[in-house]
Amino acid sequence: MRTYPIHHVDAFTSKPFEGNSTVVVFDAETLSETEMAKIAQEMNLSETVFVLPPSYSGQSADFRLRFLTRSGDEVRFCAHASVGALFALAKAQKFGMTKPGQYQFQVQTNAGTFAMHIDAANPEVPLISYDLPTIDLTVAPYDHRELANSLGIEVDFLDRSKPVMIERTNNHLYFVTPSLKELGRLVVDQKKAKELAIRDKLVIFCALTPHAFDSQNQVHSRSFCPLIGIDEDPFTGSMQGGVAAYLFKHQMVDTTLGMIGSEQGHFLGRPGQVLIEIKKGPQFACKLHARAVQLYSAKLSLP
């Protein structure tokens, strides 16, 4: 009988049953492709993450992460599952993390190898940090009314003083709503939205507002993902760089800030938040700082 340690982690939160959930599977190198897919289907979460040795030499990587959806399909990268995996590894004292301190790892994914940092000064509540990919915001090729029609919403849900924009690195679309009230009332027609998503290869529709439930935060957002079969994601780490870039580009926050708080998930009953560190330079860049909480650990047994 083969056994695999598994850990259920809620990422982008420090409270159980909030943020975005993932299951982390350790020692996955002896699992077949079919077994990984079946495990992900059984866990029935948006993504399950598998920890393996790096698949190649020549480029330095400490370990590899693979991400499979509830349908058993593999995706190149998943932010909340990455946070969950690093949190679980820190809690289990893997890869030399046996003492309080600072640790950095080169993490191989199908989207590339990334430097990820774990602040384990307090091992009970490690802080996970990593640089977000290059951000390339451009004005979208349609106006507010066209977007509203394509999403099946009233145009008044959009702040028409702010442009609709697309972040080309990840193919995420961003638009602004006037207030938290309008953001909370937003109901996207998933069928219509999927048609636009397929046509323009848009992975995420991000609705944001420069208002927040927590006074320490500067922005609240919602994430609609019909292209990948997710009506709404509780918390989407990959779109946070675009959120920060949009806010700074249009001076919707104090542009002297070195860190902004971003929240998501409250309208789904799974509130979460991250800190986005703004890295000063000729090109906008930022770094994500996230917490997580582990719900349980178990052993998965397979013949």
For the regions a language model picked out, list residue spans one by one:
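Active-site proximal loop and beta-alpha junction motif in alpha/beta enzyme cores
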Residues: 1-77, 83-303
